[in-house]
Structure formats: structure tokens, C-alpha cells
């Protein structure tokens, strides 16, 4: 099935649909790794990407953000000099009512009859003010952390800000 634009899934509609034990055929989320770099490292600065409005983030967007931020940090500061953490998990199951197109579609298609939809993916529900991605890093690499979070934020369907959670006195903006 084709990946549809994120704007289709961005809005919260109704309660979260998460009970996988009752849902058949939920595809696994594309994002499997949530900690990158050096999780055991001792870093003085912690920077986070914060959502400015509530939204749903698809598992594809989370994976794209992870790859973008991790690749940038690995190339610029090295794998042992940071810890990148994705702080949300795609629990919410997305559904789609498949509509047939092309010749003879009217004979095959059900239309809005039995329109509940089949599971097509998962999404994380993000609240306003929630931290989505966090980078722990040394003060000399602070600008690289900000750029990595900016690149990750471009993959999300909501406006964001980058805030310093720890070590604000060590970095001068």
C-alpha cells in the first residue's frame, strides 16, 4: 500500500485505538531502535525537541527523524560523543478503508458499507509541550545537537521548539 501524506493522520480523532489483542494484522512499526550513540556516557548538556501543538506522528516519520538526526550526529561528533533518545512510541493503530480504482471498481468496491477500515500502520500521539527527541551531548558540540534536532523536527507534522533541559549555564546562545 502507498504511503499517504502525513497531513491525513496528523489530527487526533477519538480515543486511541491501541488494543492489538483485538486487532488482526497490525504491521510492525518501522522504528525499532529508540536509543542511539552512547547511552552509558556522562554528558553535561541535554537538549530536547518539544512539540508546540498536539498531533499524531506516524511510525515512518519517527524513523525518518531518527535516521536524519543519528546520521548527522555520527558524521559530525562521532558515535561515542552523544546519546540520542526517541521519547515516544507509536501505539495508536491507523486504519484505512481501501477504495478500489480503475476499470470495474464499482463491481468490487463496497463503498461506505463495512467502512471501519483495515490496519495500515501505527502512530504516536504527541501532546503540546511533550518532549519527542532528546540529545545528551558535551557543551562543545551543542550547536551540532541543535542542528540534529532541527533536521529531525523537519520530519514531523507539527511546529516544534528546541529547548535546553540540562546544562543551560554551560552553553551560550
UniProtKB/Swiss-Prot annotation:
- Record-given protein name: Large ribosomal subunit protein uL16
Q: Which Pfam families match?
A: Ribosomal_L16
Q: State the source organism's domain of life.
A: Archaea
| A Gene Ontology term for the protein's cellular component | ribonucleoprotein complex
PANTHER family named among the record's database cross-references: 60S RIBOSOMAL PROTEIN L10
Gene Ontology molecular function terms on file: structural constituent of ribosome
Question: What are the protein's UniProt keywords?
Answer: Ribonucleoprotein, Ribosomal protein
Give GO BP annotations, semicolon-separated. translation
The taxonomic lineage of its organism, from the top, reads: Archaea, Methanobacteriati, Methanobacteriota, Methanomada group, Methanopyri
> What protein family does this chain belong to?
Belongs to the universal ribosomal protein uL16 family.
